[in-house]
């Protein structure tokens, strides 16, 4: 009996212990689950926080990227605006450098010095030039510095200074014989907005200058008309679309400017009109007491010198070869009286008589003859009477022709023929004698260029040349101090050889 009770008690105890142990395990599991859930929630919270931070960081990065792009765009805009402003500034203001130069060496057929120059004949004293090709031994340089600007209101300004020098010495150091000189220094004011009507678009100027509308025959080194000095004026007063006028006042000095007592000045008033291709120019001048002018020793210079003068020019500027074919041509007829009888250099000769009269005719043209041949004929003729002495007469005419034969794009053969006839009767003025006769010159010049071979106005050029010239024997007797008839340079034929460069830009 006892054994059965004991067994029952043991079974009951074991059963209770197992139940208690089971309850304990469930509680632990539940606690662990709660803790795990809590940790999961905390992890989710941390993940959400990290995600929020990541999104915030991404937004900041995006904002920074956007701002950086904006900054780059702004920088690019600034760069572009700056470039535009700099370009605009460059277009509105700037310096320019231009120039002309020629330099060469010449000798005769004995390898000795010889005479040369476009004005070497007796007619040259009154402007009778001959062909210059193979006939110049000087070094002449012009250097032009300009500053131009355009203001915001559309007005323009221009300052120009020209320095020039002429030299016949072949040495590299020639300061002691230099003719270095400031030939131009002037200012122009253009397109002034306050100007209206005919003056709209005109240009005011003042200073020392060559007149803008001078023109020349380059191949004989002669201006057709040359107005220069110190003064002021206005260009391009437009009356309508085809008519414009220039008005100017120039001053010049006569005599030795080193003489402080020399106060004779020539004042030139000029009106230059352009009607389409036609030019009509009229000038008047006055030099008070020119007939009483004295030299540095106090002696009268010329008691019959003129005090006043007039000058006129009628010109035609064509963009064809005399209306016949392609090319260019210019023609002019000039007349001068008194001080105006120096018709080329207006107002530059103070020795002219009050009764002096001069007529001049000038014409030249350029045209291609074929693909490889080009021609430039020119004529210059003048008749002047009562010029320096009563009853005197200076008549001459020059015919010149230059041909270019293109060999290739960098090499050409140039040919020039020049003929001049003169009949000079100076009536003893300046110990000159009456002569008449002819002068001839032929030149052959192989020429190197970088391009535009057939363009007569394209430079630079380097030339080799040989020239032959001859003249009537009577011309040797014109004067004792001129070229023709001088020692070793008399009629009968003269050869010369040399080389020369010429450039302009």
PLM regions and their residue ranges:
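Gram-negative bacterial Sec-dependent N-terminal signal peptides
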Residues: 1-24, 40
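Beta-barrel outer-membrane channel/assembly domains of diderm bacteria
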Residues: 23-196, 204, 237-240, 272, ...
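Gram-negative outer-membrane beta-barrel proteins
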Residues: 105-113, 151, 167-171, 193-195, ...
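Surface-exposed coil loops of outer-membrane beta-barrel proteins
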Residues: 110-133, 171-183, 194-304, 482-487
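Residues that flank catalytic or metal-binding motifs in active/ligand-binding sites
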Residues: 141, 181-183, 202, 228-230, ...
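Residue-level recognition of the N-termini of beta-strands and the immediately preceding loop/turn
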Residues: 157-159, 201-202, 245, 327-329, ...
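Detector for outer-membrane/organellar transmembrane beta-barrel domains
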Residues: 237, 242-246, 262-263, 272-450, ...
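C-terminal structured domain segments
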Residues: 434-486
């Amino acid at each position: 009996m006892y054994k059965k009770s004991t067994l029952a008690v043991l079974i009951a105890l074991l059963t209770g212990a197992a139940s208690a142990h089971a309850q304990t395990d469930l509680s632990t599991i539940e606690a662990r689950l709660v803790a795990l859930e809590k940790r999961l929630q905390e992890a989710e919270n941390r993940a959400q926080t990290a995600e929020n931070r990541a999104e915030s960081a991404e937004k900041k990065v995006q904002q920074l990227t956007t701002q950086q792009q904006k900054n780059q765009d702004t920088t690019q805009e600034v760069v572009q605006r700056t470039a535009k402003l700099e370009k605009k500034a460059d277009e509105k203001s700037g310096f320019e450098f231009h120039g002309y130069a020629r330099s060469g060496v010449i000798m005769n057929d004995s390898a000795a010095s010889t005479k040369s120059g476009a004005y070497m004949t007796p007619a040259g004293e009154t402007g009778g030039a001959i062909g210059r090709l193979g006939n110049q031994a000087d070094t002449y340089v012009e250097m032009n510095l300009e500053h131009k600007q355009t203001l915001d209101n559309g007005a323009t300004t221009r300052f120009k200074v020209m320095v020039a020098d002429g030299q016949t010495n072949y040495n590299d150091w020639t300061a002691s014989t230099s003719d270095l000189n400031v030939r131009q220094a002037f200012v122009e004011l253009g397109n002034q907005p306050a100007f209206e009507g005919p003056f709209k678009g005109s240009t005011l100027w003042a200073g020392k200058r060559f007149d803008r509308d001078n023109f020349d025959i380059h191949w004989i080194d002669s201006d057709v008309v040359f107005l220069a000095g110190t003064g002021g004026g206005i260009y391009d007063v437009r009356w309508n679309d085809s008519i414009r006028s220039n008005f100017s006042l120039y001053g010049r000095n006569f005599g030795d400017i080193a003489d402080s007592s020399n106060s004779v000045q020539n004042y030139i008033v000029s009106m230059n009109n352009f009607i389409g291709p036609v030019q009509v120019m009229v000038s008047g001048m006055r030099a008070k007491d020119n007939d009483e002018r004295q030299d540095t020793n106090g002696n009268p210079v010329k008691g019959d010198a003129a005090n006043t003068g007039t000058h006129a020019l009628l010109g035609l500027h064509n963009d064809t070869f005399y209306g016949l074919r392609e090319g260019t041509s210019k023609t002019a007829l000039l007349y001068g009286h008194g001080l105006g009888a120096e018709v080329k250099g207006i107002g530059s000769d103070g020795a002219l008589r009050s009764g002096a009269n001069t007529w001049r005719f000038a014409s030249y043209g350029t045209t291609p003859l074929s693909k490889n041949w080009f021609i430039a004929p020119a004529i210059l003729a003048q008749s002047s009477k009562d010029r320096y002495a009563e009853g005197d007469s200076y008549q001459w005419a020059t015919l010149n022709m230059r041909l270019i034969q293109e060999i290739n794009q960098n090499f050409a053969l140039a040919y020039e023929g020049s003929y001049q006839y003169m009949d000079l009767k100076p009536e003893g003025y300046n110990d000159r004698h009456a002569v008449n006769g002819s002068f001839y010159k032929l030149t052959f010049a192989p020429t190197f260029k970088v391009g535009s071979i057939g363009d007569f106005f394209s430079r630079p050029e380097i030339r080799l040349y040989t020239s032959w010239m001859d003249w009537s024997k009577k011309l040797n007797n014109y004067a004792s101090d001129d070229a023709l008839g001088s020692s070793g340079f008399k009629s009968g034929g003269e050869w010369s050889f040399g080389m020369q460069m010429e450039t302009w830009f």
